[in-house]
């Protein structure tokens, strides 16, 4: 008798055919990778095909692969990764799509297929700069209105570009260039025999 994962894998291959770029299994989970041009059509099939029946999108996030594998990775930089759930069949699927353009990463929005994608896509836009084409309200959701850049990108500086502080003279919050100076921290070496109650 075939396992649930084997049944799901066979159903996905039968329903999607050549639209499957890759379908891999790791630690009991399936990951389906599709091209950006097939993304919406595949998502509709995943939801509507009675042998698949993924009724819920339970998570969506962006991923920046710029330094993946210690910089040895040579594929597209940005991906949108969705976690799908079929309550009917009691199985899950990870759906990954890579944005074809690294300079302006655009993929289709899944809001019309799963409404739960709304805020997840806004979060991926805000933090990674992924543009979800067809999203009804694609604006920042976590960072401030005037925030510059996308803080989860691998090339975003750790200290950021600007800092925010309250100015008592202006009686409002103001932005100014970052004033954090890089420093080197030297670890303190404690050479006590009984430090912290430990016996040596």
Curated annotation (Swiss-Prot):
NDH-1 shuttles electrons from NADH, via FMN and iron-sulfur (Fe-S) centers, to quinones in the respiratory chain. The immediate electron acceptor for the enzyme in this species is believed to be ubiquinone. Couples the redox reaction to proton translocation (for every two electrons transferred, four hydrogen ions are translocated across the cytoplasmic membrane), and thus conserves the redox energy in a proton gradient. Keywords: Cell inner membrane, Cell membrane, Membrane, NAD, Quinone, Translocase, Transport, Ubiquinone. It is an enzyme of class 7 (translocase). It comes from the Bacteria. It comes from Burkholderia ambifaria (strain ATCC BAA-244 / DSM 16087 / CCUG 44356 / LMG 19182 / AMMD) (Burkholderia cepacia (strain AMMD)). It holds the Pfam family Complex1_30kDa. GO terms for cellular component: plasma membrane. It is a peripheral membrane protein. It catalyses: a quinone + NADH + 5 H(+)(in) = a quinol + NAD(+) + 4 H(+)(out). This is NADH-quinone oxidoreductase subunit C. InterPro entries: NADH_DH_suC (IPR010218), NADH_quin_OxRdtase_su_C/D-like (IPR037232), NADH_UbQ_OxRdtase_30kDa_su (IPR001268), NADH_UbQ_OxRdtase_CS (IPR020396). Belongs to the complex I 30 kDa subunit family. Transmembrane segments: none annotated. Its EC number is 7.1.1.-. Its main location: membrane. The keyword Transport applies. It is found in: Cell inner membrane. NDH-1 is composed of 14 different subunits. Subunits NuoB, C, D, E, F, and G constitute the peripheral sector of the complex. GO terms for molecular function: NADH dehydrogenase (ubiquinone) activity; NADH:ubiquinone reductase (non-electrogenic) activity; quinone binding.
């Amino acid at each position: 008798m075939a396992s649930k994962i084997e049944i799901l894998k066979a159903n996905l291959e039968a329903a999607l055919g050549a639209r499957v770029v890759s379908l891999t299994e790791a630690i009991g989970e399936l990951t389906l990778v599709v091209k950006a041009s097939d993304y919406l059509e595949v998502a509709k099939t995943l939801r509507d095909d009675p042998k698949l029946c993924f009724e819920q999108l339970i998570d969506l996030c962006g991923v920046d692969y710029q330094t993946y594998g210690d910089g040895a990775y040579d594929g597209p930089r940005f991906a949108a990764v969705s976690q799908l759930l079929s309550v009917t069949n009691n199985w899950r699927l990870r759906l990954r799509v890579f944005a074809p353009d690294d300079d302006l990463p655009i993929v289709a929005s899944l809001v019309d297929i799963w409404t739960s994608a709304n805020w997840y896509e806004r979060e991926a836009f805000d933090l990674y700069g992924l543009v979800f084409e067809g999203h009804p309200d694609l604006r920042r959701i976590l960072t401030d209105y005037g925030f510059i850049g996308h803080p989860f990108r691998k090339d975003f500086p750790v200290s950021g570009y600007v800092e925010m502080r309250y100015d008592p003279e202006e009686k409002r919050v103001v932005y100014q260039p970052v004033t954090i100076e890089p420093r080197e921290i030297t670890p303190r070496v404690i050479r006590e025999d009984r430090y912290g109650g430990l016996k040596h």
